[in-house]
């Protein structure tokens, strides 16, 4: 009893220290104030874990979620401030970077309540899980603001190392070990290729590492059309391609999705793409400014392959998580259209808007997979047959998120794709947009196939998993339903109010 009281006093004292540091940073300012909040949250988690017992576990969720919400609040207060380059040019703060940081923080904030019941049922180590999630979030935020080659390399490595550890969190699962090994090997190879490309940029620009200085250096050395820049472009595209996972750099994606814990997959499926998209826009648009035709062609090829292969292979999948893996490959093909269009025709604004909708659609679907998987122990698509008869809320929520992913009106996914394709059409990407429209129709087929299974009412089609389905008595079930409700609302309502969201996204010039 005395020990528990001492723990509570220690927690309160630690919280006071945290709030005092928060107050100092708030009123004295900081270039990386949102990142500092997460760092304080990480330190606080470690301090409490070293002195607490199992009864204090709710504090871990509270501290993690509070750190993320406070970091989002700090970003919102800093909105529309003048762009600042800090840390000797290594880090840049502007609206464009901050909106991507906001998306990453939003992903993490929704993923933590989605993970609570899974962690309790599987008895995963809660502290390490939250530490890896917050550290990966921190790495993604630094990547969004990176302004030189070294930071662009180090920040994703911070994110990637946490991703490897999270994907292999269930060490006794053979599929998880296989997925982690493949993820680690391909991640290491892609990082090596990325560094190789950066070395060509560094040498060709006369030893510059800041993005804008690289452009100036290429002009001074007259190397902007040299073969070295072509090698740098190809190597950089391959390195970034692994993070974005478009075809043909998608080989790790289905295995990691299937073998990793479902909350981890939900986290990685959105944060990695947001961070990599932010980095890709800056790298391609600034250092490779003089090679715009070449990288446009490369990205068009990746987008076409991703949209075709991702959606066609998704039709044949029997595992829900593998289906979403190939679906995500197709989705990143749509996002690449926005990167190619760029800022001239609202390409970045449409990309950011669609990614916001994709976060809600994807996390809402994964919340359903977590909830259903914990009660049935299966991931097979056919085992979802008749779920509506047992859990109408779960089935209807899943149907709305899947319909939004398919791009059916009047849901958010439809308006997001519509604006993305319209921007591509205005930019003259007629073939690319046509492929996007055709593959979107294909994707509707396999989403509707799942919805048909969910809503079936015939007893002969209802699987034993659904017949024995029982809703969880755990209080933490409310956290999954909370995440799912937020995602469903975000997947439907924003479609009616696109203009304010687009206006905010259009104000992200860098």
From Swiss-Prot:
The keyword Zinc does not apply. It is a multi-pass membrane protein. The chain crosses the membrane at residues 24-44, 59-79, 99-119, 124-144, 149-169, 183-203, 295-315, 323-343, 347-367, 395-415, 418-438. One of its GO terms (biological process) is ATP synthesis coupled electron transport. GO terms for molecular function: NADH dehydrogenase (ubiquinone) activity; quinone binding. GO terms for cellular component: chloroplast thylakoid membrane. Coiled coil: none annotated. The keyword NADP applies. Its EC number is 7.1.1.-. Keywords: Chloroplast, Membrane, NAD, NADP, Plastid, Plastoquinone, Quinone, Thylakoid, Translocase, Transmembrane, Transmembrane helix, Transport. It is found in: Plastid, Chloroplast thylakoid membrane. Disulfide bonds: none annotated. It catalyses: a plastoquinone + NADH + (n+1) H(+)(in) = a plastoquinol + NAD(+) + n H(+)(out); a plastoquinone + NADPH + (n+1) H(+)(in) = a plastoquinol + NADP(+) + n H(+)(out). It is an enzyme of class 7 (translocase). NDH shuttles electrons from NAD(P)H:plastoquinone, via FMN and iron-sulfur (Fe-S) centers, to quinones in the photosynthetic chain and possibly in a chloroplast respiratory chain. The immediate electron acceptor for the enzyme in this species is believed to be plastoquinone. Couples the redox reaction to proton translocation, and thus conserves the redox energy in a proton gradient. Belongs to the complex I subunit 2 family. NDH is composed of at least 16 different subunits, 5 of which are encoded in the nucleus. This is NAD(P)H-quinone oxidoreductase subunit 2, chloroplastic.
């Amino acid at each position: 009893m005395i020990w528990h009281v001492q723990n509570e006093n220690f927690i309160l004292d630690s919280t006071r220290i945290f709030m005092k540091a928060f107050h100092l940073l708030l009123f004295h300012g900081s270039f990386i104030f949102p990142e500092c909040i997460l760092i304080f949250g990480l330190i606080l988690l470690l301090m409490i874990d070293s002195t607490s017992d199992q009864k204090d576990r709710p504090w871990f969720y509270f501290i993690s979620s509070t750190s993320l919400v406070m970091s989002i609040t700090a970003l919102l207060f800093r909105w529309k401030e003048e762009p600042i380059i800090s840390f000797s040019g290594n880090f840049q703060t502007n609206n464009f970077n901050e909106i991507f940081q906001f998306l990453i923080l939003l992903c993490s904030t929704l993923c933590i309540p989605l993970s609570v019941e899974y962690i309790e049922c599987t008895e995963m180590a809660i502290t390490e899980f939250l530490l890896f999630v917050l550290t990966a979030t921190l790495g993604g935020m630094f990547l969004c603001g990176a302004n030189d080659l070294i930071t662009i390399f180090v920040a994703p490595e911070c994110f990637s190392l946490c991703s490897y550890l999270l994907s292999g969190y269930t060490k006794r699962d053979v599929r998880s070990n296989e997925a982690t090994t493949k993820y680690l090997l391909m991640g290491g190879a892609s990082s090596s290729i990325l560094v190789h490309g950066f070395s060509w940029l560094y040498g060709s620009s006369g030893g510059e590492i800041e993005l804008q200085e690289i452009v100036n250096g290429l002009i001074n050395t007259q190397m902007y059309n040299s073969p070295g820049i072509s090698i740098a472009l190809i190597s950089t595209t391959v390195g970034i391609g692994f993070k974005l996972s478009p075809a043909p750099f998608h080989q790790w994606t289905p295995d990691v999705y299937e073998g990793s814990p479902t909350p981890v997959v939900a986290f990685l499926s959105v944060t990695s793409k947001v961070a990599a998209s932010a980095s890709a826009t800056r790298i391609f648009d600034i250092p490779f400014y003089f090679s715009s035709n070449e990288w446009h062609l490369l990205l068009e090829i990746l987008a076409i392959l991703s949209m075709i292969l991702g959606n066609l292979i998704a039709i044949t999948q029997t595992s829900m998580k593998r289906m979403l893996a190939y679906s995500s490959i197709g989705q990143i093909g749509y996002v690449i259209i926005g990167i190619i269009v760029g800022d001239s025709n609202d390409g970045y604004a449409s990309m950011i808007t669609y990614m916001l909708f994709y976060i809600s659609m994807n996390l809402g679907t994964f919340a359903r997979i977590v909830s259903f998987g914990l009660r049935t122990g299966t991931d097979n698509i056919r085992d979802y047959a008749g779920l509506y008869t047992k859990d109408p809320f779960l089935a209807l929520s899943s149907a709305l998120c899947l319909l939004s992913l398919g791009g059916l009106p009047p849901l958010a996914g439809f308006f997001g794709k519509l604006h993305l394709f319209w921007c591509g059409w205005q930019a003259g990407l007629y073939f690319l947009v046509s492929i996007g429209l055709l593959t979107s129709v294909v994707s509707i087929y396999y989403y509707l196939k799942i919805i048909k299974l969910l809503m079936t009412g015939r007893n002969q089609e209802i699987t034993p998993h659904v017949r024995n389905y029982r809703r969880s008595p755990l209080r933490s079930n409310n956290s999954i339903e909370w995440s799912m409700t937020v995602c469903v609302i975000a997947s439907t309502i924003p479609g009616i109010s696109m203009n304010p969201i687009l206006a905010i996204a259009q104000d992200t010039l860098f």
